[in-house]
Amino acid sequence: EDQKRRSKRALTDAIDRALIDLLAIYRDVLMIQVGGDGELINTDLADLVGQIARDSTHRQTLARVEHIETARKRLVSNGNPLLVLEDMAISLRPQA
């Protein structure tokens, strides 16, 4: 039982770290969209960040950030990791 709980916690922590990394990417996207003068956190992903910034609006980016934050909250509240990630992934799809 204890091992099962530790395993679930490790999975949740790993997913949360990945979501924090994703938030950092969207922070960079938003910074480009609003013309911020700060440096990119994800310099290795500058091309991808630039493309996302060009292909979306700052409102879409803010909505995506909110969806990622919601996913993090649901994980902490013992949400099913697969369902949480699926819901978030659907919300992050590019808008037509």
Across the structure, where does each feature detected by a protein language model lie?
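Terminal low-complexity regulatory extensions
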Residues: R64-E66, I90-R93
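AAA+ P-loop NTPase domains with strong preference for DNA replication initiators
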Residues: E1-S56, R72, V76, L83-L92
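Short glycine/proline-rich, acidic loop/turn segments that cap or connect secondary-structure elements
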Residues: R54-E66
